[in-house]
Amino acid sequence: MEKFLDINEIKKIIPHRYPFLLVDKITELEEGKSAVGYKNVTANEYFFNGHFPEEPVMPGVLIIEALAQVGAVAILSKEEFKGKIAYFGGINKAKFRKKVVPGDVLKLSIDLTKIKGVAGVGKAVATVDGKVAAEAELLFVIGK
């Protein structure tokens, strides 16, 4: 189950690139089932220039996107989906519980709960220092 992917290996699986690649490393990967990744949130993030200049907070939508990218790595590691693209198909039950600020290390965990055909559902949780920052149910659709 333990499988480490650095940024270069992540870029071989998902098409995201700077400034929209929001995962620095994957530390756990169970192919087609689950993954855990990390994002080191620094004061140099482009989005802090406008969100918010006097009180920088990582936008919740980008936390969800980071979770979706980890989910994409998990689902695209499944043999039948290798080399394809995972699209964000939907989001349910999103909750934001803690601000994410410069200096935080965002732990991004996803468990794929259902895969049927080219669609999947995952339970996603983002934490900082063991405290839940955001959680949601994410839906994926596999493209070409």
Curated annotation (Swiss-Prot):
Q: Which UniProt keywords apply?
A: Cytoplasm, Lipid A biosynthesis, Lipid biosynthesis, Lipid metabolism, Lyase
Please name the GO terms of the biological process aspect recorded for this protein, alphabetically: fatty acid biosynthetic process; lipid A biosynthetic process
Q: Which GO terms describe its molecular function?
A: (3R)-hydroxyacyl-[acyl-carrier-protein] dehydratase activity
The record, for CDD domains, names: FabZ
EC number in record: 4.2.1.59
| UniProt cross-references to Pfam families, sorted A to Z | FabA
- Where it mainly occurs, coarsely classed, is cytoplasm
The positions flagged as active site in the entry are 51
The entry's localization annotation reads: Cytoplasm
Question: Is Nuclease one of the keywords?
Answer: no
Task: Look at the named UniProt entry and state the broad enzyme category this protein falls under.
Answer: lyase
| GO CC annotation | cytoplasm; membrane
User: Catalysed reaction per UniProt?
Assistant: a (3R)-hydroxyacyl-[ACP] = a (2E)-enoyl-[ACP] + H2O
| Known role | Involved in unsaturated fatty acids biosynthesis. Catalyzes the dehydration of short chain beta-hydroxyacyl-ACPs and long chain saturated and unsaturated beta-hydroxyacyl-ACPs.
Entry's family note: Belongs to the thioester dehydratase family. FabZ subfamily.
Instruction: Supply the name of the protein.
Output: 3-hydroxyacyl-[acyl-carrier-protein] dehydratase FabZ
To which species is this protein native? Clostridium botulinum (strain Hall / ATCC 3502 / NCTC 13319 / Type A)
